[in-house]
Each structure stands twice: as C-alpha cells, then as structure tokens.
From Swiss-Prot:
Subunit record text: Homodimer and heterodimers.
Protein family per UniProt: Belongs to the Casparian strip membrane proteins (CASP) family.
Keyword presence, rRNA processing: no
Membrane topology: Multi-pass membrane protein
Protein name from the UniProt record: CASP-like protein 1D1
Compartments, as annotated in UniProt: Cell membrane
Listed transmembrane segments: 23-43, 74-94, 119-139, 161-181
Annotated organism of origin: Musa acuminata
GO CC, any one term: plasma membrane
One Pfam match: CASP_dom
Keyword annotations of the record: Cell membrane, Membrane, Transmembrane, Transmembrane helix
Membrane side Cytoplasmic: residue ranges: 1-22, 95-118, 182-191
Superkingdom of the source species: Eukaryota
Segments on the Extracellular side according to the record's topology features: 44-73, 140-160
Length: 191
C-alpha cells in the first residue's frame, strides 16, 4: 500500500527548510516602528506646573516645577535602550534583506541573529520594566517610604512616560518573537 503524502520529492533530496526571512524582515520593521514611536513619546515627555507652597506670605505662593524624563535615571536608561534598539533594528533589517535576496543563508548568520536578538530582548525588557516601575510609583506613590504620587499634578508627563514604557514592552515581545523565529529557522536548516 502506498502513502499519499510525500516527504521527499521524486529526485530523492530532502525538502528545503522554509524560508522565514520575509516574516523576519516584517518583525524587524515592526520593531523599528515601535522603538522609534516609544523614543519620540519619551523625548517629548515634558510638563511644567505651578505647585503651591506652604511658605509664609513674603515668599511666592506657587513655584513653577518641570517634570522631564531627564530627571530619572530609569527614563534615561529607557532612552538609551530604545536608541540602541532603533540602530540595531536598522542593521538587522539590512542583514535580513540580504538574506532574502541571497539564495541560501548561512547558519552562522542565523546563530548570530539568535544571540544578538536575545541580548537586545534582555536589554529592552529590563529598560521597559525599570521605566514601568518608576511610572507606576509616579501614578500610585508609595506610602511606606513617603513617596507621593505625582501623576495627579503631571498628568501629560505621566501619560507620555507610561505609553513609552508600554510600547517598549511591545518591542521586547517582538525581540523575543525574533529569537524564537531565528531559533526555529536555525533548527530547520541544521537538521
């Protein structure tokens, strides 16, 4: 009795592994878009508010205070991580495009993509988590250490910072997806 499914073509050679570089290129394009948008939103997060003081009458009743992303090391770390991710995604998009246009890609390039994507995923996840925790402290405060919430005063600033942290988390998920995709592609080529 003969089987109706064929694993090998008539010539006897194995079926070539699927070329997933089109998907890889698309994910890297999404990574660039998410990193650039998070970067722009973070850089534009500045707000100035007049805050009342409890000083005696000869002193001003209100003080003008700025909220900027530069005031927090966590947000500076997020800025650097997003900048590096933008640069990295451009470089790897070029490499992915070169892999699409070449007839066969080397397992060595796939291995380097897996390693570098994993490192970048770790950097982006840590930066997004750090910025998210500081944004949460700004939103809710911490009564145990007398840190007051500031998002009731600096609402626009908090929206920008929170949105940037959320989109950065999307960039980390895209990087993890790229690690999985490159690992699968490498596995299929080396089998």
């Amino acid at each position: 009795m003969t089987s109706t499914s064929k694993d090998t073509p008539e010539s006897g050679y194995a079926v070539p592994p699927p070329n997933l570089f089109g998907v890889d290129f698309g994910l890297r394009l999404l990574l660039l878009a998410s990193a650039v948008s998070a970067l722009v939103v973070l850089v534009t997060s500045k707000q100035t508010e007049s805050i009342p003081t409890s000083l005696p009458p000869p002193f001003p009743a209100f003080i003008s205070r700025d909220a900027k992303f530069q005031h927090s090391p966590a947000f500076i770390y997020l800025l650097v991580a997003l900048s590096v991710t933008c640069f990295y995604s451009i470089i790897t998009m070029v490499a992915s495009f070169a892999a699409i246009t070449s007839p066969s890609s080397s397992p060595r390039m796939l291995f380097h993509l897996v390693l570098s994507d994993a490192v970048m995923a770790g950097v982006m996840a840590s930066a997004a988590g750090t910025a998210g925790s500081v944004a949460y402290l700004g939103l809710k405060g911490n009564s145990h250490v007398n840190w007051n919430k500031v998002c009731n005063v600096y609402d626009k600033f908090c929206r920008h910072v929170g949105s940037s942290a959320a989109v950065s988390l999307v960039a980390s998920v895209l990087l993890v997806s790229l690690v999985v995709l490159s690992s699968y592609s490498l596995y299929r080529r080396c089998r």
